[in-house]
Amino acid sequence: MHYPEPISKLIDSFMKLPGIGPKTAQRLAFHVLDMKEDDVVQFAKALVDVKRELTYCSVCGHITEEDPCYICNDKQRDRSVICVVEDDKDVIAMEKMREYKGLYHVLHGAISPMDGIGPEDINIPSLIERLKDEEVKELILAMNPNLEGESTAMYISRLVKPIGIKVTRLAQGLSVGGDLEYADEVTLSRAIEGRTEM
């Protein structure tokens, strides 16, 4: 079907988002067309602001408005423990349970040879550098319980063990193949409490 060019561009833009196919993109584009102009302007501004006003923490890699982020700046945090996660949504999920008091390191992905993603393509080199500078006693590997997450956890574990840092993995209770961000607070809390050494 041929759409006016502005609608086609909007549909193409929506399709760049994960999980948005042609039909959903079309539905969203026509919904935007029906919105009040003020709401569309506010929506567009929010999209631009998220790119312009946020950055990644130079210490942990978490999204932030100021560098270092509020977590790395918090002097009450236990600096001897770092929880390594795949993405920012995982930090948010962990923080919701209000039990973990250590620091984080965000990888921004997982090792996935099938997708051409190796250890150098995610935030692993900065983690190793960070471990040299800080007095970390434990590294909690909180990758998603899927093939990529397990591969990433094993890779990091092998790199870190010779340094003499205790490496633990979240307890299973998280479903295999599931994502950390969708786990409820109770499940996450139990997984943290029952973590195992690697």
UniProtKB/Swiss-Prot annotation:
One of its GO terms (molecular function) is DNA binding. The keyword tRNA-binding does not apply. May play a role in DNA repair. It seems to be involved in an RecBC-independent recombinational process of DNA repair. It may act with RecF and RecO. A zinc finger (C4-type) spans 57-72. PROSITE patterns: RECR, TOPRIM. Residues 80-175 form the Toprim domain. This is Recombination protein RecR. The gene is recR. Belongs to the RecR family. PANTHER family: RECOMBINATION PROTEIN RECR. InterPro entries: DNA_Rcmb_RecR, Hlx-hairpin-Hlx_DNA-bd_motif, Rcmb_RecR, Rcmb_RecR_Znf, TOPRIM_dom, TOPRIM_RecR. SUPFAM superfamilies: Recombination protein RecR. One of its GO terms (biological process) is DNA repair. It comes from Staphylococcus carnosus (strain TM300). It comes from the Bacteria. Keywords: DNA damage, DNA recombination, DNA repair, Metal-binding, Zinc, Zinc-finger. Signal peptide: none annotated.
